Amino acid sequence: MASLTAGTVLTIEEIEINGASDYVHGGNVDSPREGPAPGSYGLTIEGWVLSRQIPIEHVEVLYQERPLAVVPVERARPDIAAGFPGIEGADRSGFLATISTLKLPPAFELVLRTKLVDGTRLPVARLRGRRRRLPAGGGEEIQPLMLNTIGRSGSTLLVTLLSSHPDVVAFSPFIKDARVSTYWANVLQDLAEPASYLAPFDPPDLERPHWWLDGGVGELGEDEVERWLGSDSIELLSAHCRAQIEAFYANLAGPEGARFFVEKYLPYQVIPDLLAEMYPGAREVILVRDFRDMLCSVIAFNRKRGWSDFGYTEGGDDAKYVREVMHPSLARLAERLRGEGTRPYLIRYEDLVLGPEPALAGLFDHLGLAADEKLVAEAVKRTREETASMDHHRTTSDPVASIGRWHDDLPGEIAAVCDEELGPLLAEFGYEAL
């Protein structure tokens, strides 16, 4: 198995090809090969796939079922035409996809999947690899406190409690749901795409908006220049994006300063892993709430506002929502909790509501922050004062009434679906099933 040696940016450790099936004559990944890839955070995947009868719509490059690239199958492949004489489409059965590996954690697994025009999806290949971690700052700067959670779990309450500590800063959590670090991390990820950093050398149309994001993906003919653009230049850009995050929160904290800034993140995002590379002192907190109460809150909050959010549609299939929206997100949270990368700390909404002082003191202590009784009591008191008038954010008369509401609000058949689909996850996070 290939290893990530000093100076190597990216290595492919294993490639699995699915080969022929009832639907396709075959397929392959020609590039990259197993072993060290060209010295760049950009990854180019080139190959071919040939359908037997049903035409191919496109090839998808997926990470954890989320598409990173969707490309047509139309590149000239005279070699495949020669190997499959008389087979329609063999001469143009090639595909080419480019992605930034900064949209992946340092160790990753990609799935290549083809979609036929009738909607059938078939795996083509699986790639496992690793990339170099981004250079980190010195650690003296303000560090991210990453709250990883799902909507209607009490995240705004927790952000307010955390930012009541003198060493933690957040931007007006009950007014704006600020995502400053996500913004700059996304800027970094998008500009680290080969289609972006190669765009200045073959711009398709300078009059087209955002041409710098999806320009050319051809080769420059200057290997060293292309290597620098895809590695050293990306690391310089990473430092710039990190500096922008730090500058915003340093300005927000004022002359007193702060050790942490706190923002929310979603389970599917790679951003917490990326920030953990950029910041040596990054910490992660996972917030959960009884999933059944959370579902009740999502439904009630959407009805209260009169529009759909959190992936839930009024009048939709609640069982399908539990299976296809809630389960994947909660499973990802569980995966993060088991991981060791950011040493995540688990906190439950119910503990914040029923015993905020001990829950908050334990969290502050875990973060290495002052956690004396007076400071914690003042943080809880300040939060209660700030949230007293936030009725528009609530769906019950008070937070205590929101605990266990599912016993009355959730139809029995949906509660049973939650038990069936989410039972092991409920137990893992410390909740009892039916």
Predicted regions and their residues:
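PAPS-dependent sulfation machinery
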Residues: P173-F261, R305-T313
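ATP-binding Walker
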Residues: R152-S153
